[in-house]
Amino acid sequence: MEHTWRWFGPDDPITLDEIRQTGATGIVTALHEIPNGEIWPEAAIAERKRLIEASGLAWSVVESVPVHEDIKQGRGDCETHIARYQQTLRNLAACGIDVVCYNFMPVLDWTRTDLAWPLPGGGTALRFDQTAFAAFDLYLLERPGAEADYDATERDAARAYLDGLDESARQRLIDTIIAGLPGAEEHYSLARFREVIAEYAEIDAERLRDNLGHFLRAVVPVAEEVGIRLAIHPDDPPRPLLGLPRVVSTPRDVQWILDAAPSPANGLTFCTGSYGVSAAIDLVAMGERFAERIYFAHLRATQRENDPRSFHESAHLDGDVDMVGVIKALVGEERRRERDGGPRLPLRPDHGHHLLDDLSRDTRPGYPLIGRLKGLAELRGVETAIKQLAI
């Protein structure tokens, strides 16, 4: 498999020269400076590619070309934004880039409540605490109708949690949820966030799914024409939040997506950390079922807590994810592709604990150098063992 590393562009404090030392050969990145809904110019793509290749690496995957909210809502300038998305795909293909990751999560990208949760060994991890999230939803955001999503016990626990926070901790919780985590392209004030949430008041899961289908039927033929493989990323966590619908959370959702626009260009990002939050999903079985359409793998593990809706990001080989089984399934698919002439299979260590020098270095939450280096080394070790033992 192709070992890749997410890099956030020239402003990333982790340099391409450092990434090359990790053993990764491919870069996963995007033109983050271009606003959502705008066309990525071919010249800008080519220049970023030249920068990456000058360090002896390859631009392997785009993560992500963001999908504009007008497309998700099926409103406003939806068709204009779809046309721009199509042109961006053409421009990427003209530069030889052939895998594009994207998501269809309304408003929020991936969501956490704590960006530096202490680990027993002294490092820190990302965490989602259901009670903290409920406190934000009920008493900081004050979302209309939120009370119906929580029972009395949950509301009382959320109030008690909030009462235990000083003003700086309350603001930190707000910023963590709405200010945008790495990879998110939109950043909101609390007031603007309320307005954007309200725009989805009449959009349920069925309507959001219809809008996704419309998008797929428009962009998948273009992707197939120019030789790009689209890889949709799952919801994180894989369930509705803040009254917003989510439609990329289960194997059933994935099957619907593949059926909505049947094409080898229509595939998925297999993110074990996102799907793995759900105890109902057998990740190994899912990987085997959809192996042929997995065009990008995010390998990460999570550990569910006493309240199974709460979780923290564990070490890559720990937690609730059968990572050995997942990698075995991916190696099997890689062998099939090598035999049948299929496409390459890039993977990246998705997130990592902040360890050692990471704790004093200004890096993006979840994207440290040493923590991901450790994760990549562990994943490569499992892959090598499976291949050498012909498991």
Swiss-Prot record:
Function noted in UniProt: Catalyzes the dehydration of D-mannonate.
Region of interest (Disordered), residue spans: 334-359
Alphabetical list of Pfam families matching this protein: UxuA (PF03786)
Family recorded in the similarity comment: Belongs to the mannonate dehydratase family.
Protein name: Mannonate dehydratase
GO molecular function, one term: ferrous iron binding
Pathway the protein takes part in: Carbohydrate metabolism; pentose and glucuronate interconversion
GO biological process: D-glucuronate catabolic process
Cofactor field: Fe(2+); Mn(2+)
UniProt EC number: 4.2.1.8
Keyword Lyase: yes
Organism: Chromohalobacter salexigens (strain ATCC BAA-138 / DSM 3043 / CIP 106854 / NCIMB 13768 / 1H11)
Keyword annotations of the record: Iron, Lyase, Manganese
Annotated NCBIfam families: PRK03906.1 (NF003027), uxuA (TIGR00695)
Matching SUPFAM superfamilies: Xylose isomerase-like
Catalytic activity: D-mannonate = 2-dehydro-3-deoxy-D-gluconate + H2O
Presence of keyword Manganese: yes
